[in-house]
From Swiss-Prot:
Is probably involved in a pathway contributing to genomic integrity. It is a single-pass type I membrane protein. Belongs to the IRC22 family. Residues 183-237 are cytoplasmic. InterPro entries: TRAP_alpha (IPR005595). PANTHER family: TRANSLOCON-ASSOCIATED PROTEIN SUBUNIT ALPHA, TRANSLOCON-ASSOCIATED PROTEIN, ALPHA SUBUNIT. GO terms for cellular component: endoplasmic reticulum membrane. It comes from the Eukaryota. Pfam families: TRAP_alpha. Residues 21-161 are lumenal. Its main location: endoplasmic reticulum. It is found in: Endoplasmic reticulum membrane. This is Increased recombination centers protein 22.
Length: 237
């Protein structure tokens, strides 16, 4: 069976409306006897009653196993689904509908295929509800696979992560630039304005010469010699 472009286009349109609507397996499958099951290849030990521990930034692969119990051929043409709230079934995030194969499953036969899912969700608890789209003769139907409880966690951040180191370097450089700017505009002026002014030391003045007492109250050099002789002769008497 060869799918035309119009069928692929219809697949995407149906996926967008069907995924957002409440799950109604009876209405979706039209009561076709087509059994769908899957395992998560990264967690093969996880069963439908367990909780899968998933990590953001990684990808998981759903390995489908389908069995056609009808008396006519059925072709798997696409995959989709959603992550729902496990408490009330409301859709939190839709999975992008994507074309598959088509994978022809003859009457009474089995087949397998893989759906890859990139994880980029808000860390929370979810119910993973995959869907597959099948072409039955001229009809396009979707089949709701079982739900899988899952917890999505964020990837732990390493201190040696290159992106984190780059952001830290940018942050430190920015803070350093701001501090230098503040210091250059206000800090330097404040420090210069409050710094104590050093007093200049004065040179000690040389001591004045001390006059030696000679018993005279005046300098006799300017007195005429005759006057001095006269004064001495008076003292002799």
């Amino acid at each position: 069976m060869k799918l035309s472009f119009s069928i692929i286009t219809a697949l995407v349109a149906v996926a967008s409306s069907a995924i957002a609507a409440p799950i109604d397996p009876e209405k979706a499958t039209g009561s076709i006897n087509f059994v769908v099951d899957y395992t998560i290849s990264e967690f093969p030990e996880i069963s439908n009653t367990d909780v899968a521990e998933l990590t953001n930034g990684e990808a998981i692969s759903l390995e489908y196993s389908v069995t056609n119990n009808e008396d006519k051929d059925i072709s798997v043409v696409g995959v989709g689904g959603s992550f729902r709230d496990p408490a009330n079934g409301n859709v939190k995030t839709n999975l992008t509908a994507a074309a598959v194969g088509p994978v022809l499953v003859a009457a009474g036969e089995k087949a397998s295929f893989i759906q890859k899912i990139d994880l980029n969700l808000v860390a929370d608890n979810y119910l993973l509800t995959p869907q597959i789209f099948v072409a039955v003769e001229e009809d396009l139907k979707f089949i709701q696979a079982r739900g899988q409880l899952a917890t999505v966690n964020d990837l732990p951040i390493s201190l040696f992560n290159l992106q984190l180191l780059f952001l830290e370097a940018v942050l430190l450089a920015t803070i350093g630039g701001i501090l230098y700017f503040v210091y250059d505009i206000w800090g330097k002026r404040y420090i210069e304005g409050t710094a104590p002014i050093a007093k200049s030391s004065k040179k000690a003045s040389s001591p004045s010469p001390v006059s030696v007492a000679t018993g005279k109250a005046y300098n006799s050099e300017w007195i005429p010699e005759a006057h001095l002789k006269q004064k001495k002769s008076k003292k002799a008497y």
